Amino acid sequence: MLSAKVLLNSNFLRKQCPLCKSYFWTRRADQIYCGDQPCVPYGFIGNPPTKTSIESPAELRERFLRFFERNGHVRIKRYPVVARWRDDVYLVGASIYDFQPWVTSGAVPPPANPLVISQPSIRLTDVDKVGRSGRHLTGFEMMAHHAFNYPDKYVYWIDETTQYAYEFFTKELGIPQDEITFKESMWEGGGNAGECFEVLVRGLEVATLVFMHYEVKDGKYVELPLKIVDTGYGLERIYWLLKGTPTIYDAVFSHYLAKVRQKVGIPEPPADIMGRASIYFGQMDPEVIGLDKAYDIIAEKIGVDPKWLREVVRPQEALYVLADHSRTVSWMIADGVIPSNTGAGYLARLLIRRILKNLRVVGIDAPLVELFDMHLAELKREYPEIWAARDLILELVDLEEKKYREVLKSAPAAVKKALEEARRRGRAGLDTDDLVALYDSQGIPPEIVAEVAKSLGAEVKVPDDFYTKLAARHAKREKKPESPLVEMSKVADLPRTRELFYEDSYMRSFKARVLRVIDGRYVVLDQTAFYPEGGGQPADRGVLKFQGGEAKVVDVQRVGHVVVHVVEGQLPPEGAEVVGEIDWERRYSLMKMHTGTHVLIQSIRRVLGPHIWQAGAQKDIPSSRLDVTHYKLPTAEEIAKIEELANKVVQENLPVYVKIMPRNEAEAKYGFILYQGGVVPTREIRVLQIGPDEEPFDIQACGGTHLRSTGEIGLIKIQKVERIADGVVRFVFTTGMHALAYIQELERKLAEAAHIIGGSREEFVESVKKLLQRAEEAERRAKHYAELYAAVVAENLRAEQIGKYRVAVVELNDDELAKHIALAATRRDKDLVLVFVGGDRVTIYTGGVDVTPVVKTLREAGFRGGGSKTFAQGLYKGDIQTLKEALKKALS
């Protein structure tokens, strides 16, 4: 049983709902049901439970935050919607995501305790219900207060949390005490769990109070050292409750919807019809009974024709989807997501295409970029970061709409091919797996697949929860299974390796003691200057020297808290003292590459925009690569600007600092741009700063070895820029002497090319232009002479009369000349069948004769190929005489 003092002291009664069997608390002796959907209908639509006047979600948010500030909480800024500090999910789905796993595990203290926040969150778990149910959103703000109770520090728990909720709803919002129900439940998410109260008012869940004290491990609950108050008050839900509008969209997006309706010519729906439809939709699950059936049931309950109801409701659903999804997508892009076919970009594209699909169904053809821009104008006051990204958002949305239209053009052929493949496998139509494959591989929405299939005489059933299932498949990051170099059990008892490469990255040699030799090739030292592979930087190489021998170090890896050296040659005995010598030339080159990577990505961000995030990197010799998120291939001018800025930073010889900072302090000071290189799983963060404190050029969390100043890089040269995936661009670059060697090699090739065409390097471009002009003139003349020759050959063809057709077989191994001859010959003789034989290739041209029966007969003689009605080509390994006989047989 879950209870609280405020409930016991305020005359609440504990009851059990006869329908769902849940226990709940209410002050009303006559309340029978739990107060939640679907056990009770909405009771607030057209009838808000309070007269408290709140004119906007922004005003409600501020009242919530101030209420908790008055009650001893520290207000903190919202986190991004992209969870860059986590390696398990892409998007923030609740305010507690901000603190998982580092704070909730006890590894890192919270930024304040207790704290209050209003966190934009994204959940696609009910994406198919958005627009239909009247209450579901993909993007929402979770207002929340959190308290973190440690064994030695109690903040507050169930009693105080419930008291705060009770006072906020009754005193701050003026909702009568008898209207509030506390329903007991269990919550689980993000690897944690705990009992909870769901706060309900007139059938609507407006808050959840979670008392988190479990970690979920292998499906079992394990007690956490912390007891965490994790609350979630739905900003949009509460505002809807206060307004009593037919749907949540009409409350939250009222101004935007009014403008869109006016632009696209869709009238505002009858409020009573939409309100009643929303009430009934709230009590059923269309995914279970089917959307069409749901419409029929609701129409019957309201007393209207189902067809009329669809005509009224369906256009509104499309506009609701537009309103919700456009805000969610704008949040995502403003926080650095580029629509693509992978990761968070996949989810952004899914939402954009769902908007386009819904607008298409109801016949709205207004440019999506214009509809988005209207919404951005509405959002700019509450979310200035969205307005700051306006140009990027509109450019990406416009690009995505163009891609979608291309998809629609290619859909018929792709669906036809998929149906043919299904029939070959003995299936009459396409199943859900086929729909997923067509969407993931070619971006074709299932509704379009169904349309095309129907035109081809096949029925395709589109699941009502199709997009929800798609989103679930792509919501989590894929973790690559780790296989440690040696078993943890073999090093678990050893002390942590002292990491000399961090104390002095310029250390070339060092002394150490051998703690353990494992499996005849792995050596663990008490301290090392050998850098273990990590963060895209390869491991150091070198030697270990000891009395009586020497071992070559060929690899270095971290295994838990120790550094393991992979060696070849003689093995040092355990307990021996060794001298480690780093391959300094290689290490120093890698340091230049690593510091150069930081300089380069910041240069790319400053030229292409703040949406640039690292998607991967590998430092190597003589070249390194840096993958970044970007929606198109940079122009030559942009690449030149990036290279110029990077080398300007090198020339300025900016200092490079390493700071060890507490995680919270670093995040508060620098933001989540720290995690360009990925998640850092430590309580303290090693922060690399390029440039002085008053004006740093770049700041990132990084565990690599770096230079003392940018001048040591010497030179940064971009060698190649290519698009390696949808939304990902790769920069291949080099630094220092390797860059000089690359430039010298280019100059050598340029000089060689200039010599070949007869000119100097300085005159190379002009020489190439003249050479191309001569080549074009020669090609033009060759074509002219070929046409003249072809006309002569065509006029003198020796053709044999076979039936009513004339047949000529010509041995010629020149496709281009054959085309010219065929064009000239078939233009003057429509009954001509002209066959060219060149090696084992056969090509047939006609002036209008159907070659289909000819090809069929030739196949019997060994011909393998096909073509159109008047043209065929393929392979034939027989003799010409057999070919002629087959032609006679076919044309006689």
From Swiss-Prot:
Zn(2+) binds at H594, H598, C702, H706. It catalyses: tRNA(Ala) + L-alanine + ATP = L-alanyl-tRNA(Ala) + AMP + diphosphate. It comes from the Archaea. SMART domains: tRNA_SAD. GO terms for molecular function: alanine-tRNA ligase activity; aminoacyl-tRNA deacylase activity; ATP binding; tRNA binding; zinc ion binding. Gene3D superfamilies: 2.40.30.130, Bira Bifunctional Protein, Domain 2 (3.30.930.10), Threonyl-trna Synthetase, Chain A, domain 2 (3.30.980.10). GO terms for cellular component: cytoplasm. CDD domains: AlaRS_core. The keyword Cell inner membrane does not apply. SUPFAM superfamilies: Class II aaRS and biotin synthetases, Putative anticodon-binding domain of alanyl-tRNA synthetase (AlaRS), ThrRS/AlaRS common domain, Translation proteins. It holds the Pfam family tRNA-synt_2c. Keywords: Aminoacyl-tRNA synthetase, ATP-binding, Cytoplasm, Ligase, Metal-binding, Nucleotide-binding, Protein biosynthesis, RNA-binding, tRNA-binding, Zinc. Its main location: cytoplasm. Consists of three domains; the N-terminal catalytic domain, the editing domain and the C-terminal C-Ala domain. The editing domain removes incorrectly charged amino acids, while the C-Ala domain, along with tRNA(Ala), serves as a bridge to cooperatively bring together the editing and aminoacylation centers thus stimulating deacylation of misacylated tRNAs. Catalyzes the attachment of alanine to tRNA(Ala) in a two-step reaction: alanine is first activated by ATP to form Ala-AMP and then transferred to the acceptor end of tRNA(Ala). Also edits incorrectly charged Ser-tRNA(Ala) and Gly-tRNA(Ala) via its editing domain. PANTHER family: ALANINE--TRNA LIGASE, CYTOPLASMIC, ALANYL-TRNA SYNTHETASE. Belongs to the class-II aminoacyl-tRNA synthetase family. This is Alanine--tRNA ligase. It comes from Pyrobaculum islandicum (strain DSM 4184 / JCM 9189 / GEO3).
